[in-house]
A protein has these predicted regions:
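A short beta-strand->alpha-helix segment at the C-terminal rim
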Residues: 111-115
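A short, conserved, highly charged catalytic patch centered on acidic carboxylates
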Residues: 1-109, 121-161
Length: 161
């Protein structure tokens, strides 16, 4: 899987549009990592409507959350957004909205990721304080480090509080 993702990152066709970035790079990484975490499901492009009055409605690219006993999505603790047109600022606005929505559902800690597929940025919202990691990671230069960070986030959100 690692070699396929590496090939996809180096293939210009993977960056034709937002859909190909999601399908050829982001999804395979998330699905590969999630296989190690029974409770953490990858929810792709599902509605996440928490508070319409506060504007906390939408369809984030990916939410990582357990299933409810009825098969629906429980409160997510990790949000991954594809940075449309390489716009990280807009991507973080969308990610932070999903993270705040989770905090309204009593999440004390929520992680966020914004990526172009090649460049990955990481942040967290803890007790209403947002922290953006000042170092972005290049999957082109260090795919293993990208996997390690995503895996670390899955591990953190999979542990009981």
């Amino acid at each position: 899987m690692f070699s396929i993702i590496t090939e996809n990152i180096n293939d210009g066709l993977s960056f034709v549009n937002e859909v190909t970035i999601c399908e050829r790079i982001i999804s395979p990484i998330l699905i590969f990592v999630s296989r190690n975490y029974e409770r953490s499901n990858v929810w792709s492009h599902v509605s996440y409507n928490v508070d319409e009055k506060k504007g906390l409605v939408g369809e984030p690219d990916y939410l990582i959350a357990p299933r409810t006993k009825y098969g629906g999505m429980a409160r997510p603790s990790l949000c991954i957004i594809e940075a449309k047109r390489d716009d990280f600022e807009e991507g973080w606005a969308q990610a932070l909205a999903a993270m705040v929505a989770s905090s309204l559902l009593d999440a004390k800690l929520c992680y966020g990721v914004v990526t172009t597929g090649k460049t990955w940025e990481f942040g967290k919202l803890e007790d209403s304080v947002f922290t953006l990691d000042p170092i972005s990671i290049s999957a082109t230069d260090n795919l293993q480090k990208t996997f390690n960070i995503i895996n670390w986030m899955f591990d953190k959100i999979s542990k009981p509080v």
